[in-house]
A protein has these predicted regions:
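Polytopic alpha-helical membrane-helix bundles and their juxtamembrane interface segments
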Residues: 1-39, 45-61, 66-183
Length: 183
């Protein structure tokens, strides 16, 4: 196994995301899509980091995260808006996902995953600031903190790197986002 801690923390993020996502299927299908797609991305990412760093697996990982971003934006639009604005935002989320997925078929750099997720988190934050939901805003804040920790390259230990820290922080963010969706 190449990166055992990264595999374990990625799989833990996957387990939490899939568990919480399955609990959302009956109440918020779009947020369930976000959680389940992120869970799939974490399973694939953990497998890529630990066992098999092939291109197809990486593509599937990045595309899963794009689907998760769609679910976050569309789910937030459904929860906070109505009418024409809601249709516009969901259409935007679909277009954003299609453009991202098309781009990622030919690009591998993680910066594009960050850009897509970051823009989704910004939209989610704005929507839940407008229709105030403190749990969602806390989840977005912890997600941003997780991304910054990952980008920093900071490692708590030689066997606990920035990816591992990201996974742990993002797992906490998933609980906050779940609480916000269930509110």
């Amino acid at each position: 196994m190449n990166e055992p801690t990264t595999v374990l923390t990625d799989y833990a993020l996957a387990a939490v995301s899939i568990f919480l996502g399955s609990k959302l299927v009956g109440t918020s299908k779009l947020w369930a899509v976000a959680f389940l797609a992120l869970g799939l991305g974490a399973v694939l990412g953990g497998t890529w980091h630990g066992f098999c760093d092939n291109d197809a697996l990486w593509k599937a990982t990045t595309l899963s995260v794009g689907v998760a971003s769609f679910g976050m934006v569309a789910g937030s639009a459904l929860a906070t808006t109505s009418g024409a604005l809601q249709r516009l935002l969901i259409g935007f989320a679909l277009g954003k996902m299609a453009a991202y997925c098309a781009w990622m078929l030919y690009h591998d750099d993680f910066i594009w995953v960050i850009a897509d997720t970051g823009s989704a988190l910004l939209i989610v934050a704005l929507l839940h600031l407008w229709r105030f939901n403190g749990w969602m805003l806390a989840g977005v804040a912890v997600s941003v903190l997780a991304g910054l920790a990952q980008a920093s390259g900071f490692a708590l230990h030689e066997r606990f790197n920035q990816n591992d820290l990201y996974h742990v922080l993002q797992t906490a963010a998933m609980f906050l986002l779940y609480r916000g969706v269930k509110r």
